[in-house]
Amino acid sequence: MTTFDKGAKPDIGTFVAFDHVRFVVGNAKQAAYWYCANFGFEPFAYKGLETGSRITAQHAIRQDKIVFIFESALLPDNSELGNHLVQHGDGVKDVCFEVEDLDSIIAHAKAAGATIVHDITEESDADGSIRYATLRTYGETDHTLLERKNYRGAFLPGFKAHPMPATFFKTLPRVGLNFLDHCVGNQPDLQMDSAVQWYEKVLKFHRFWSVDDSMIHTEYSALRSIVVTNFEETIKMPINEPATSDKKAISQIQEYVDYYGGSGVQHIALNTSDIITAIEALRARGCEFLSIPSSYYDNLKERLAASSMVVKEDMDRLQKLHILVDFDENGYLLQIFSKPCQDRPTLFLEIIQRQNHEGFGAGNFKALFESIELEQTKRGNLFYDNVKDGNTK
């Protein structure tokens, strides 16, 4: 595991934080409801036929500082969203960052050769105005850069209060997720470095953390990962790629690439200050998470006993809930991973709690990979010999 110095502050505008994540899905209304019922969000903003939007419907849901938007086409001839859906299935299209001084950021991005999907645009309503531009990053994933200092509304121009009452969702156990911790992008083999260089060159992000396949591997598969972040280190974007296996096994990263149809967002990590309460609530709501064997916790207890680190959470409850623990001399983190959120084995969510620990669970990667490999085996996707032309032998 390697960490990096962030260097001098870039001479362009500021990347403030994650603003929201936009998904392209087959049915935005149903997807929004599913995430609300399962993961503790509540509907809060809407754009569709009733608000004057004739092309797409967008349902925005929120939990504390986390905002997801689900977008679907309204008309059958919408080839942009239609083609995206056929190629990738339900998935993340846009990871939006709030920024300050949009002009300088976009001027630099253009000079660096970035693909500009939408140049700087201003939109307004009775609550003020926003300015934004959209860049293409890896695959067909975009980053919208949003300047909202002159906007006083609840979300964005054109959105109205969501018509779906939150009464039912308020009867379910409260989850308590607080903010978006990091957003992970998977790349085909040997494309991680070019994706990382895009963030360094176009957005002036810096490398924060990395691991390679000598550290992260199982008997069957491995990965390499580099985390990039803005100068303030409020936006963290891990970039993964698979490592080749001599056992003809399919890495979980490669499985994602195969089923998503290329590079894309693999998972979104949501931060909580009380992961035990959060996971108990999520399981009560029906969320499914990866299972971790008891041997992992036996080994964890031995490693903790040989260290000076004290985990204040009850280990028996962590084990019962299948929550993973990683630690170093400074602190620890607790994390758990959902099963895929759609039929394709692509996007999933991570729930994470940090106690003075800024890593990404490198000590848990082996246990996580082995758990995912069990799921791949159930899907018939662990070995190339079992898969041919999309069909399981």
From Swiss-Prot:
Disruption phenotype: RNAi-mediated knockdown together with fah-1 RNAi rescues the impaired growth and fertility defects in the single fah-1 RNAi mutant. PROSITE patterns: VOC. One of its GO terms (molecular function) is metal ion binding. Pathway: Amino-acid degradation; L-phenylalanine degradation; acetoacetate and fumarate from L-phenylalanine: step 3/6. The keyword Acetylation does not apply. It catalyses: 3-(4-hydroxyphenyl)pyruvate + O2 = homogentisate + CO2. Key enzyme in the degradation of tyrosine. This is 4-hydroxyphenylpyruvate dioxygenase. The gene is hpd-1.
